[in-house]
A protein has these predicted regions:
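Positively charged, helix-rich recognition surfaces that bind polyanionic ligands
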Residues: 179-401
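Gly/serine-rich nucleotide phosphate-binding loop at the start of the catalytic core
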Residues: 1-91, 112
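A general secondary-structure signal for short beta-strands and their flanking turns/coil
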Residues: 3-9, 174-176, 201
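Generic structural signal for hydrophobic core residues of well-folded globular domains
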Residues: 40, 96-100, 291
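A general structural signal for short secondary-structure junctions and capping/turn motifs
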Residues: 1-3, 129-130, 169-172, 194-197, ...
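Acidic carboxylate diad motif detector
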Residues: 55-176, 184-187, 322
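Stable alpha-helical structural segments in soluble proteins, enriched in small hydrophobic residues
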Residues: 32, 87-99, 381-391, 395
Length: 401
């Protein structure tokens, strides 16, 4: 069986004796990054190179060679460690490639503007950190005059035993410093969806709703027979908690609108954000655990056109279970892949208008439905079943072609 890998980011709260040094380091990093970004804009001939080749080209332009080569544009900074410099080069190159790809995909002519500075956090390559443990790390930081090794304390979840740590990033967010550590983990099953369907493995289809049920899940076997059903609940509780916070924001506006505060009601909006992330993580974990229990190796989401999605999200409200569906999808993709489950998106056309049992037209009545032949039940489960069957039929049809 093919194996693959997934990368997830673990976030640690960072505590240290000199937080101002972290600020100075970020400021210095942005200056170096800005220099290389502007240099890149002047040399379009290296834009098509890959990141490693771009790094070599930029270093030849700015760093003196061992053979006595004089650089064309010497780096205008003193005491820039090699891995600090390479981290800045890598981020500048990635920023430019992302920018050019955006225009290339849109078909528009490339018209770039030079930013005053690039809003980037410091990514620490090897050589800039050491002694990483679950509760501490040593970082090389700039105090404005010289480089120092600073011991920092970490608070967060433990590192997976089978995980390989990649280059961490120090991020300043919500008045605190955080260490974002990407972790690479191996997945036991890296087969694509086509290979899994040929093996007639179980499929789990998901229908998101705007009720107490965040998501209705249905597992079908290779023949389309229903094996298990699971509903992820908590939508009403989420909606109620959001409503309480929104009411507090509305009441406080009487006092905050007049004082011109730059971040009025920040603590309430932060709670809303944390609440949304909590439920999105909880529901996505429930769905993945259900798939593992029922041995479903393919997970299917409904896909809608952009205009329909925009209208539905607007009508349901920003803090509704259905609106949270997009965040749940986002978390599901990496959580599912880390356990060897493939995620697919399939057009939802026709899944909510016909009966799963007989294919007849249905009439909706709240959360229930009744078809023209008398079959009735949950309309969300009916949609999930139809989505799963549609997925199986699509792959069956492709095999025959």
């Amino acid at each position: 069986m093919k194996t693959g890998y997934c990368i997830k980011t673990i976030k640690y709260k960072l505590r240290c004796s000199h937080p101002e040094w972290l600020t100075e380091t970020e400021k210095y990093y942005r200056q170096v990054l800005d220099f290389y970004f502007r240099l890149l804009l002047e040399h379009e001939e290296i834009w098509e190179l890959n990141l490693l080749q771009m790094q070599g080209a930029l270093e030849r332009l700015t760093i003196a060679g061992r053979d006595g080569r004089v650089p064309e544009r010497p780096l205008p900074f003193d005491k820039v460690p090699v891995y600090f410099r390479r981290s800045a080069i890598n981020k500048a190159s990635a920023s430019l490639k992302s920018y050019t790809e955006k225009y290339k995909n849109s078909g528009d002519d490339l018209v770039y503007t030079i930013p005053d500075t690039i809003d980037a956090s410091v990514t620490y390559f090897k050589g800039m950190y050491k002694d990483f443990r679950e509760n501490k790390i040593s970082l090389k930081v700039w105090d404005g005059k010289k480089w120092n090794w600073m011991d920092c304390r970490l608070k967060g979840q433990s590192m997976p035993e089978d995980g390989m740590m990649l280059s961490p990033t120090v991020v300043f967010r919500e008045k605190e410093f955080w260490l974002h550590v990407p972790v690479k983990q191996q997945t036991e099953d890296a087969r694509n969806a086509k290979e899994r369907m040929m093996s007639r493995e179980n499929v789990c289809s998901v229908q998101f709703t705007n009720t107490d049920i965040f998501a209705m899940c249905c597992v079908l076997d290779g023949d389309g027979k229903q094996k298990a059903v699971y509903s992820c609940r908590g939508g009403d509780a989420y909606r109620s908690k959001c409503k309480v916070l929104l009411e507090k924001i509305e009441k406080s506006r009487v006092y905050t609108d007049k004082d011109n505060a730059p971040h009025a009601n920040h603590k309430y909006y932060l709670r809303l954000k944390n609440l949304s992330e909590h439920y999105a993580h909880q529901v996505s974990r429930e769905i993945v655990d259900f798939c593992v229990r029922e041995e479903a190796s393919v997970l299917v989401f409904p896909s809608y056109d952009k205009e329909f999605t925009k209208v539905v999200r607007y009508r349901s409200g920003m803090y509704s279970p259905l609106y949270l569906g997009s965040r749940i999808r986002e978390f599901l993709k990496y959580k599912a892949w880390s356990t060897g489950i493939v995620v697919l998106e399939l057009s939802a056309e026709g899944t909510s208008s016909k009966c799963f049992v007989c294919g007849g037209k249905i009439k909706k009545n709240g959360a229930m439905f009744e078809c023209e032949n008398g079959h009735q039940g949950s309309r969300f489960l009916n949609s999930a079943r139809n989505l799963g069957v549609k997925c199986l039929k699509d792959f069956e049809r492709k095999r025959k072609i």
